[in-house]
């Protein structure tokens, strides 16, 4: 068991090293898109399932509250939080529509959808992306493996942050790090700090 635990740490470290080579440009581009979205008076909607829903909530909390510096709240909504809305849509229509219907109501041109799925094949996240595109929103996707069906929906205006791994747990670990990098870039671009302070 101890060896298995050590192997998990080693795999996680190696995946992060691989990601540190593969992802900085896409993370930086996504952060810049988010900064421009927020400067334009728009908001960021986020969605995912399971651990990815938790990541969507984590991202939203960092923007609404703060990441590492004191600053005003920034507009972000995790679409996985309203259980009454989610269960009503799932019951009356289908689980695949729990995010898309919210986006049709809340999404505006210029908003960003942060779509999170380790496989890139989550049906409700794909429907969310389709709804976002119909609302003239931009998409930042956090995926892994081969990017799944989500990769095929992205245009040159969108950004995919695809973790170079096929292991769900390792992908989730890098997703959290990527979210922290996004938050850090957003904060430091919108609210520059004296690095020596």
Curated annotation (Swiss-Prot):
Ligand binding (Zn(2+)): 58, 62, 172, 180
Cofactor: Zn(2+)
Occurrences of domain SIS (ranges): 34-196
SUPFAM superfamilies: SIS domain
Gene Ontology process terms (BP): carbohydrate metabolic process; D-glycero-D-manno-heptose 7-phosphate biosynthetic process
EC number: 5.3.1.28
Any GO MF annotation of the entry: carbohydrate derivative binding
Cofactor note: Binds 1 zinc ion per subunit.
Locations listed in the record: Cytoplasm
Pathway membership, UniProt: Carbohydrate biosynthesis; D-glycero-D-manno-heptose 7-phosphate biosynthesis; D-glycero-alpha-D-manno-heptose 7-phosphate and D-glycero-beta-D-manno-heptose 7-phosphate from sedoheptulose 7-phosphate: step 1/1
Family annotation (InterPro entries): GmhA/DiaA, Phosphoheptose_Isoase, SIS_dom, SIS_dom_sf, SIS_GmhA/DiaA_subfam
Catalytic activity: 2 D-sedoheptulose 7-phosphate = D-glycero-alpha-D-manno-heptose 7-phosphate + D-glycero-beta-D-manno-heptose 7-phosphate
Pfam family, one: SIS_2
Note from the entry: The reaction produces a racemic mixture of D-glycero-alpha-D-manno-heptose 7-phosphate and D-glycero-beta-D-manno-heptose 7-phosphate.
Subunit structure as annotated in this protein's UniProt entry: Homotetramer.
Entry's family note: Belongs to the SIS family. GmhA subfamily.
Protein name in the entry: Phosphoheptose isomerase
Lineage start: Bacteria, Pseudomonadati, Pseudomonadota, Gammaproteobacteria, Alteromonadales
Name of encoding gene: gmhA
């Amino acid at each position: 068991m101890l060896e298995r635990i050590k192997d998990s740490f080693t795999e996680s470290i190696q995946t992060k090293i691989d990601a540190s080579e593969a992802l900085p440009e896409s993370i930086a581009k996504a952060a810049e898109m988010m900064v421009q979205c927020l400067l334009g008076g728009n908001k960021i909607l986020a969605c995912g399932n399971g651990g990815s829903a938790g990541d969507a909530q984590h991202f939203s909390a960092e923007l609404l509250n703060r990441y590492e510096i004191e600053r005003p709240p920034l507009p972000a909504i995790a679409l996985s939080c309203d259980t009454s809305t989610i269960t009503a849509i799932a019951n009356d229509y289908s689980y695949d529509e729990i995010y898309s219907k919210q986006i049709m109501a809340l999404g505006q041109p210029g908003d960003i959808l942060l779509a999170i799925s380790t496989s890139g094949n989550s049906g409700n996240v794909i429907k969310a992306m389709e709804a976002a595109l119909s609302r003239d929103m931009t998409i930042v996707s956090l995926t892994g493996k081969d990017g799944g069906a989500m990769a095929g929906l992205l245009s040159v205006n969108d950004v995919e942050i695809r973790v170079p791994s096929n292991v769900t747990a390792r992908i989730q670990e890098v997703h959290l790090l990527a979210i922290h990098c996004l938050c850090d870039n957003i904060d430091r671009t919108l609210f520059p700090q004296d690095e020596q302070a």
